[in-house]
């Protein structure tokens, strides 16, 4: 893999200098980098890249950072004994705050 990267850089350097100077060289070097990076990461299907949509990434970050309003508990995936213990503690806390627990 490293050999193919070095070989690609070398051919870009020689081909770029022979056909049009530094600007052509830089254009050749950097125009294919995203495609090569995606293919080396296994993100291509032969017809283009998969999952490289920046809007989807931004939406994922926004959804992951949403925080529920104060006083509203998020849905829990716990079950069984853990859920029962959580409910008991939550109910005891509410009763304590409401002042319905007698000492």
From Swiss-Prot:
Keywords: Capsid protein, Viral genome ejection through host cell envelope, Viral penetration into host cytoplasm, Virion, Virus entry into host cell. Pfam families: Microvir_H. The keyword Cytoplasm does not apply. One of its GO terms (cellular component) is viral capsid. One of its GO terms (biological process) is symbiont entry into host cell. Transmembrane segments: none annotated. It is found in: Virion. Its main location: virion. Minor spike component of the viral shell. Involved in the ejection of the phage DNA in the host and is injected with the DNA in the periplasmic space of the host. Involved in the determination of the phage host-range. The virion is composed of 60 copies each of the F, G, and J proteins, and 12 copies of the H protein. There are 12 spikes which are each composed of 5 G and one H proteins. This is Minor spike protein. It comes from Escherichia phage St-1 (Bacteriophage St-1).
């Amino acid at each position: 893999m490293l050999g193919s990267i070095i070989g690609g850089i070398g051919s870009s350097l020689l081909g770029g200098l022979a056909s049009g100077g530094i600007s052509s060289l830089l254009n050749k070097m950097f125009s294919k980098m995203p495609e090569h990076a995606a293919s080396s990461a296994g993100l291509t299907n032969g017809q283009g890249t998969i999952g490289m949509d920046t809007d989807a990434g931004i939406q994922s970050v926004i959804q992951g950072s949403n925080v529920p309003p104060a006083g509203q508990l998020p849905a829990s995936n716990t079950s069984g004994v853990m859920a029962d213990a959580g409910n008991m503690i939550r109910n005891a806390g509410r009763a304590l705050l409401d002042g319905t627990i007698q000492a």
